[in-house]
Amino acid sequence: MKIKNSLKALKARHRDNQLVRRKGRVYIINKTAPRYKARQG
């Protein structure tokens, strides 16, 4: 999982990326291509 300051550019890298908020953190999840997982931090 990548940890980035800004997820906006990462979200555009794959069309199945979803932006979700869990426990006060922002994540990108991708069920079809899990290598795009990322967390903002």
From Swiss-Prot:
State the Pfam families in the record.
Ribosomal_L36
> Which GO CC annotations does the UniProt entry carry?
ribonucleoprotein complex; ribosome
**GO MF terms held by the record:** structural constituent of ribosome
Q: Which UniProt keywords apply?
A: Ribonucleoprotein, Ribosomal protein
For this entry, list what GO says about its biological process: translation
Q: Spell out the family assignment given in the record's similarity comment.
A: Belongs to the bacterial ribosomal protein bL36 family.
Descriptive protein name: Large ribosomal subunit protein bL36
